[in-house]
Amino acid sequence: MNESYQPTLIEQLAQEYWEENETFEVKEDLSREKFYCLSMLPYPSGDLHMGHVRNYTIGDVIARYQIHKGRNVLQPMGWDAFGLPAENAAIQRELPPAEWTRKNIKKMRKQLKQLGFAYDWSREITTCDSTYYRWEQWLFLQLYKKGLAYKKNAIVNWDPVDQTVLANEQIVDGRGWRSGAVVERREISQWFLKITDYSEELLKDLDELKEWPEQVITMQRNWIGQSQGVIINFNLEKGPDKLQVYTTRPDTLMGVTYLAIAPEHPLAKERAKKSKKIAAFLKKCKQTRVAEADIATQEKEGIDSGLFAVHPLSKEKLPIWIANFVLMEYASGVVMAVPAHDERDHEFALKYDLPLKPVIEPADGHDWDYNQAAYTNPGKLINSGSFNDIDSKTAFNVIADYLKNNGAGSRQTHYRLRDWGISRQRYWGTPIPIIYCKTCGTVPVPENQLPVLLPEDIIPTGHGSPLKETASFYKTRCPVCNKPATRETDTMDTFVESSWYYARYSCPDQDKVMLDDRAKYWTPVDQYIGGIEHAVMHLLYARFMHKILRDLGLLNSNEPFIRLLTQGMVLKDGAKMSKSKGNVVTPQSLIKKYGADTVRLFIIFAAPPEQDLEWSDSGVEGAYRFLKKLWGFSYRIKDALLAINQQKERSNYQWEAPEHRQTRQQIHECLQQANIDMERLQFNTVVSAVMKILNILIKLTTDNDAEAHLIREGTGILLRLLSPITPHISHHLWQSLGFGGDILDTPWPRPDPKALQTTELELIVQINGKLRGRIQVPTEASKEIIESTALNQENVQRHLADKKIKKVIVVPKKLINIVV
């Protein structure tokens, strides 16, 4: 053991030890309790950033802690390697995405290993490898057979110059990020997964997720968006057709003054053929972004279709407007507008001089100016004929029943959740295993022809679809009739890859089936760690896919992740670290200067995992100083500990002196609190406990036999508490001080109940119920000793002067009250 702390050397030695001994390679063992710890897999951008390091350090602390607790721990790592960023980088660098991606993976794998994470690298997966995505294609075929994968027209952002579909984030001020062309809304045929078939179960099973953050549960609940409402039929004034409207407010039905339909509604398209004005309006609507949030915040615009519908109750004529705020994807693409009781409808009605008809007044009877604002709260019905004077809640049921009995409507449970559109008109993704034949139609690729390989030598230009221009890919033969046919050139949304990867880690070497029985052993994941930005997309899709895999008999649990931790962001100068802000601190530079353990210690100590972490250079320096202090202390006590650790009776030492028992009590109290905090994932306060223990131990001397044994016990506790957080220095010191071989083979420390037993108690002394002092007495002191000690306390004596004591009441182990 060197006198000075040399992190680069000891970290290299520890990492070599773990690799040579395959320390973190695990096998299934039914005799042991398993623990599956997983951090969200990274996109291989080429460089780890501090957000990565924080995420993975938190996960590693949990995994190593569970190893110490004797569990069979799996902590794997892999790469979410497909997707748009790689395609964009390839366009800029003029090289294939495959080449760029694999180079980045190699670089990032090295960076992760430098941080000493306890990963089972034998299970590494890369989602752009055909050995991975062939099973995704197999899964797609199973969904297709069950009717859970289907194709329909849907609206996308279309760049007319680059002839490609754009993601919302690729649009800047309404224009394509590369071409600068005005983006259009275009309807194209796309593949969907029927997640809506699982809406009810996805919602219900949120109640099972007792160890997920409430915020994530709420976000998913809102995203699924269950509502109880009514489908109402509005017959067109002319002809047999009708419009169906879904509403959660049937109590406002008598206040409908117009209907609004989506620009993509068949009725709107039909009217555009007969009206240039309507055609021009629909063309303008095509230049609106597809995102629901953008549509909600844009200026409300519309045009009168010239058509009328008939109110199902009053039989009044209602004008039908085409409006840019109505979504074709929501319900039936038709809205019943009640401007007196809906803010958006109110805004639109005022703009186009449409009538307002109040049908609900405040329950307390106070006046409301409906021209100024919509009244959106519950109340009492007015201007509603036979429904007048009914309260809103009752009116919901009364009107719903009336509509049902008269064939004009029906109750319906509705979900905001839409089917998952997985088609991407991009190159760098999993090919969808479908063939189109002029004779046989849509034909799934036979399972024995999987995988449909993605050509990896393509250099995308950003114009059009590279796969549509690659004849060697799309030209094929129909597996049914053997005539010339074409492959599907859309690829899958990368969220598909990340929706089942956690299960594949259990059996990445399996080439006969998607998942084998090892997946049933390891899943569900016991602890999942990742950012809250994935609350509704990734986490919802993974929950959906888990239920699919369960229904296919591949898994035997309902949910993929038992416990979820959403770590906070890493901030510098109050803002999230980013290259654009110029506030990035690179992990590599810090590891080189201070070592990985210092980086890990700072990240864990600076803030609780779920809170944002404010970067502090002085905090990093402080972490480094602490590790140097620990090293210096260990070097000083090395010889004494080596000698004690060779003794057979070292663990049965009895401390007799009160001061030594008190010191031992302090150490075990720190340990007791650290164990509570470890279970609560409050790792920053575990570090605080470690620092307290070191400060206690430094004051002791190895020249005194009792204190030397205290140092040995305390150091053994300290190193194990630090082991998950700063594994390299803990590993090295454990061996150098003679505690044994691998620190990970030792059980997690538990406080000694005897050490926690106090020898003295503090009692409150009251006179006539008022606090007058505090006394220290032996734990088992008699009533007489307690009384005597209290009456001799200086402040008590002062308050008793010239007073007559009537009685003394002793409440055991709490207080003594002197009545005068």
Swiss-Prot record:
A GO molecular-function descriptor: ATP binding
Cellular localisation: Cytoplasm
Major localization class: cytoplasm
One Gene Ontology cellular component annotation held by this UniProt entry: cytosol
UniProt: ATP binding residues: K579
GO biological process, one term: leucyl-tRNA aminoacylation
Catalytic activity: tRNA(Leu) + L-leucine + ATP = L-leucyl-tRNA(Leu) + AMP + diphosphate
Domain of life (superkingdom): Bacteria
Enzyme class: ligase
Motif 'KMSKS' region: chain residues: 576-580
SUPFAM superfamilies: Anticodon-binding domain of a subclass of class I aminoacyl-tRNA synthetases, Nucleotidylyl transferase, ValRS/IleRS/LeuRS editing domain
Pfam families reported for this sequence: Anticodon_1, tRNA-synt_1, tRNA-synt_1_2, tRNA-synt_1g
UniProt motif ('HIGH' region) ranges: 42-52
Keywords from the named record: Aminoacyl-tRNA synthetase, ATP-binding, Cytoplasm, Ligase, Nucleotide-binding, Protein biosynthesis
EC number, as in UniProt: 6.1.1.4
Transmembrane segments: none
UniProt family annotation: Belongs to the class-I aminoacyl-tRNA synthetase family.
Name of the protein in question: Leucine--tRNA ligase
Taxon lineage: Bacteria, Pseudomonadati, Pseudomonadota, Gammaproteobacteria, Legionellales
Gene name as annotated: leuS
